[in-house]
Amino acid sequence: MRLRKLVLTALLVAPLSCLGANNDQLRDIMYADQADRQVAPGPDQWKDISKRDAARRVKVQAELAAGRVKTSADFYNAALVMQHGDTFEEIRMAHALATIAASLDPLDRSARSLKAKSWDRLLLWQKKPQWYGTQYVRHGNGKWALDEIDESAVTDADRIELAVPTLAEAKKQVGVMNRAK
């Protein structure tokens, strides 16, 4: 329920996005989130990263509750952090925030891409196949694969519109990832 209130608050302040500057604290939180993922973390490192992720999500929720998420960049930064959530509600919030970011700035390829990625992640959390083909999984044998995809859900034109690879490009990426191993 608390997450729902935060999303509703975010939706109410979204029209005010043209009135403020980007939130530097949210930007810094997002940079820290991404810095943890720059070098492929080993299994032992994920426990510490998960703790830092949880702390960052608390900070993002505080910024949302305080009404300090106003611009497309703010919503994008918040969404990127929230998509590393541990619960369905956090992933759903990430998708809502990414959708707002993409709506506020339809020309922002990163926001449109995150909208597709967060949707795929949300579907997978519900044990449903992803639509856009943005989520990869590493099997016990160390090989990468695309997580299950409903290939009939969207077209490659839809994927291009949301700035994600076509299905053929996503499948090709699996080979690249496995060769880089």
State what each model feature region is:
Residues 1-7:
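Bacterial N-terminal signal peptides that target proteins for export
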Residues 7-8, 18-19:
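Cleavable N-terminal signal peptides
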Residues 14-16:
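N-terminal signal peptide c-region/cleavage motif recognized by signal peptidases
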Residues 22-43, 70-84, 108-124:
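Amphipathic alpha-helical repeat scaffolds of TPR domains
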Residues 47-59, 88-91:
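Helix-turn-helix repeat elements of alpha-solenoid scaffolds
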Residues 60-63, 67, 101, 108:
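Alpha-helical solenoid scaffolds that mediate protein-protein interactions
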Residues 71, 112-181:
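Terminal, low-structured helical/coil segments at or just beyond the last alpha-helical repeat
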Residues 92-107, 136-137:
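TPR/TPR-like (Sel1-like) alpha-helical repeat modules
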